[in-house]
Amino acid sequence: VNLTKGAEMNGKHRIVVIGGGLAGLAAAAYAARAGKRVTVLEKAQAPGGRAATQHRDGFHFNLGPHALYQGGPATSVLAELGVTARGALPPASGYALDGDRLHVLPGGPISMLTTSLLTLAGKVEIARFMLTMRFLDVAALARTSTTDLIAEKVRTPEARRFLAALFRLSTYTDELDRLSAGAAIVQLRRAVEDGVHYLDGGWASLVTGLRAAAVTAGAEILTGAKAEAIERRAGGVAAVRIADGRRLEADRVIIAAAPETARALCPGVPALDAWVDSAVPVLASCLDVALSRLLVPRQRFVLGVDRPLYFSEHATVAKVAPDGGALIHVARYGRAADTEAVEQELEALLERAQPGFRDVLVHRRFLPAMIVAHDLPEAARGGLAARASSEIPGAPGILLAGDWVGPEGMLADASLASARAAARLAVLPLTDRTRLEAAPAPG
């Protein structure tokens, strides 16, 4: 729905959602289902944000590697909203790259016994950690770094490197010295116990499903509509101004956007300023490649052990390529000081896994320093519990949603959990609802 003018714009909109990514669409669907009038403002020409998928010659390109974690807030929100995410679990088999040597990836009992990546002592340590991980107290580990946890739990150098690689894989970050061990354990548990799915059609399937859920419930979605300012009044909000001069009256506003965008829309609020100032973005560089065929079918997954590298072919698991085609994501977790060197490193890994790939290359795309998530759950700040809350102390009527908001999960789990929380608060009257404790500002 793309309304540009007319009577539809003149009435009072109870809830305005700024941002049409996963969090914004989910929040809109929840609020509209509660019977509220909802308008979503998306500055781009189509909703989706970083969950958008580009379609080229039958290939479905996500913005870098995406996997939907099962058993967490994301899957529960999708189920509540009636969104079906079709896909499949990738195999646990693959290879580990340590130095210049490929080893069998220890992804199960047999591969654990046969891999040359780990010594016997290292295999015992990794097996023991995996068996006992479910008993770890994640709350008690909130202020412990993942690096310190690894050092405490395993002793052999190769086991430490491999465990670090598993944490990088499940959290999409290489800053393990800063990452809260509590948050990391939750992610790794979910990956090991519930698994992840590569989605048919890419993540556009989630965007399509959430958009349909919102529109079916009665929400309006305005594309090409950039929110410029929120008009505030005593005790709440009055309206949202759009960059083209339009004005939408509102009782509540949900900002489902990046931290700096939230600050620009809601300036002069100390709690929000503190959250934004302390946010640490999670970055990765990604090389996405479409091939007419897979040259070495057995080498579909490679995990870097001594370097934060990732290689995975998604089309053998999910419907993201034409018949026989291969869609490969190669990534380096972390900040890239030299983007040209990183691109060459990713191409070298691709050549190692699929020698001669250039002969069957259909499309390639390099995304340097892409934002994976807007805030790393830092041990120094107390992990997940220290992230921004949906309610902003000092800004009644304005709520937050996104992967940097709320105490639940990381990545899409955080986006959708915070969307549900923000929508539930947005539909309650300010005067009648039970007052929740305001989250403390970081510091």
Locate each region found by the language model:
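A short alpha-helix-loop-beta-strand transition element characteristic
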Residues: 75-98, 155-164, 280-281, 296
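Mid-domain catalytic core of redox enzymes
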Residues: 228-337, 389-390, 440-441
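N-terminal Rossmann-like FAD-binding beta1-loop-alpha1 element of flavoenzymes
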Residues: 13-40
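Conserved FAD-binding subdomain of flavin-dependent enzymes
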Residues: 53, 58-89, 120-141
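Rossmann-like flavin
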Residues: 99-102, 113-185, 193, 197
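Helical element adjacent to the flavin cofactor pocket in flavoenzyme catalytic cores
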Residues: 186-238, 242
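Glycine-rich FAD pyrophosphate-binding loop
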Residues: 32-56
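Conserved flavin/dinucleotide-binding core of flavoenzymes
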Residues: 314-443
